[in-house]
Amino acid sequence: MTGNEQRRPAAEGRLAAVLHRWDDEAAFAAGQAAGTAWSGGALRLTAPVGRETYADPFGHGSLDWEYGSWTSPWAAMPFAATDIVPSWTADAPDGARITVRLRIRDTGGHESGWYVMGHWSSGDAVVHRATVPGQSDSQGHVDADTFTAVGHGVSACRLQVVLAREAGGDVDVALRGVRAVASRPPVGATPAVSGPGGAWGTVLDVPGRSQGAHIGHCPQWDGGGEAWAGPACTAMLVEFFGRGPGAADLTWLDPDDPAPQVDFTARHVYDYGYKGCGNWAFNAAYPARYGLRGAVVRLPALTDVERFISAGLPIATTLSFRSSELSGAGQSAAGNIMVVRGFTTGGDVVVNDPLAATDAGVRRVYPRAAFERVWLSGDGGGGVAYLLHPEGTALPPPVPGEPPRW
């Protein structure tokens, strides 16, 4: 879509969402590269164009880095968006990092400066991955992984990714894909519960991992328990695809840990700026080390989730709710993440809910109407989900006549 195309109003009462993605050679060729080039299935730092000193505020001090960059073209919105969440797939081992930036154009025609949406490295020995607090101006503000517009809606956005490595080093840093999901909350009456989407009676065999089994673990990475819904769900998804850390990666953990891969995941998704493990983009980025692509998306109905279940792909959803709003939950959650693994023959939602006390108790079934209402509500989840898939896996076809959402 070009910047001159007319924006179509989103359906009343329905979450509006669109995903802009750049994840192959042709897509990256449409942007502006500086010191980076496509090679071996990724955009790589090949000829650094500058040096900078980056001061890590979380303990590693200042280091000199050499860098290149890639800047996307402007991506127009089919509606006036209020929120944007970038996500990415990148190879950035110790000694490398990427910085993801966002610029918006509002419906009044004004362009913003660059917002920093994250400094990312898959390890933590050289630099700490972190978002940047305190970014706010007349056009919007950044809260960890999410940009929220103020005043005017967003008519277009662009992303810039800086690929950096320690000056004089030879670490390979590569960008395999970058995305931006933009959304607008529902307007008007709450839509009726969605009907069948093709996956009723399909339940995927996703291993169960409880965050409750890790209470008190690794306090430097938020201490397990209620804080580890993201790591538990991400570990489940990675394990579903037969991937994950090996025994040699886990030697620093307690040998009696019931599921050390959850602790490992928590360490490697922890956002030192946000001081937590719930950064959606970081959870979607972590699995790149195992050859998995991840993306943060927003979906307006469970019928979209059913498309992924039918394709054999479980998906993580984020919800906030009071216990009275979700029958069977047994407790309230200010910000939980659950893996949707399928649907009953009657259309109710089969999940792995990591709030359970043990791995054996995570499988639960929630009423379709209640789950969908909570997940889609503006204060309950806003339709946020993140998905993982192996390189080369075909995703479900887009919904005809609607903006792409994955």
Predicted regions and their residues:
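Actinobacteria-biased recognition of intrinsically disordered, low-complexity terminal regions
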Residues: 1-10
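Noncatalytic regulatory segments and standalone regulatory/sensor domains
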Residues: 13-63, 76-79, 99, 104-114, ...
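Active-site-adjacent structural segments surrounding the nucleophilic cysteine of cysteine proteases
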Residues: 19-21, 162-276, 403-406
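Conserved active-site-adjacent core of cysteine acyl-enzyme catalytic domains
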Residues: 38, 59-63, 72, 253-405
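Short linear interaction motifs
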Residues: 64-69, 80, 139-141
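Short, surface-exposed loop/turn motifs at beta-strand boundaries within globular domains
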Residues: 65, 79-81, 95, 227-231
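A short beta-strand element within beta-rich, extracytoplasmic domains
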Residues: 79-93, 161, 321
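Short coil-to-beta strand junction motifs in C2/discoidin
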Residues: 93-101, 334
